[in-house]
Amino acid sequence: MNIRPLHDRVVVRRMEEERLSAGGIVIPDSATEKPIQGEIIAVGHGKILDNGSVRALDVKVGDSVLFGKYSGTEVKLDGKEFLVMREEDIMAVVEG
């Protein structure tokens, strides 16, 4: 897949949701919430500042991130679902 987000946008693949309860019961799609954690797949060149300079993004490809429940725009590419969002919609980078 070749996608290059513009400016301060990033492409995120959601982490797989847990489909099995602690007791071993399979949870249907309709009963699970979409995860708010994902992996950065692609990043733009950076945020264009008021003075015209470009600030590089703090996140990079491969980072595991947390984002808001309603962040980003869902897109489907090559049969897979991704989110395109601005860097400011990312709340944290998960390390370790």
UniProtKB/Swiss-Prot annotation:
KW Cytoplasm (keyword) present: yes
Molecular function terms from GO: ATP binding; metal ion binding; protein folding chaperone; protein-folding chaperone binding; unfolded protein binding
UniProtKB keywords: Chaperone, Cytoplasm
Gene Ontology cellular component annotations, sorted alphabetically: cytoplasm
Subcellular location(s) per record: Cytoplasm
Keyword Ribosomal protein: no
InterPro entries: Chaperonin_GroES (IPR020818), Chaperonin_GroES_sf (IPR037124), Chaprnonin_Cpn10_CS (IPR018369), GroES-like_sf (IPR011032)
PROSITE patterns reported in the protein's UniProt record: CHAPERONINS_CPN10
GO BP of this protein: chaperone cofactor-dependent protein refolding
SUPFAM superfamilies reported in the protein's UniProt record: GroES-like (SSF50129)
Chief place where the protein resides: cytoplasm
Alphabetized HAMAP family for the sequence: CH10
UniProt similarity note: Belongs to the GroES chaperonin family.
Function in brief: Together with the chaperonin GroEL, plays an essential role in assisting protein folding. The GroEL-GroES system forms a nano-cage that allows encapsulation of the non-native substrate proteins and provides a physical environment optimized to promote and accelerate protein folding. GroES binds to the apical surface of the GroEL ring, thereby capping the opening of the GroEL channel.
Subunit details: Heptamer of 7 subunits arranged in a ring. Interacts with the chaperonin GroEL.
Listed NCBIfam families: PRK00364.1-2 (NF001527), PRK00364.1-5 (NF001529), PRK00364.2-2 (NF001531), PRK00364.2-4 (NF001533), PRK00364.2-5 (NF001534)
UniProt name for this protein: Co-chaperonin GroES
Recorded name of the encoding gene: groES
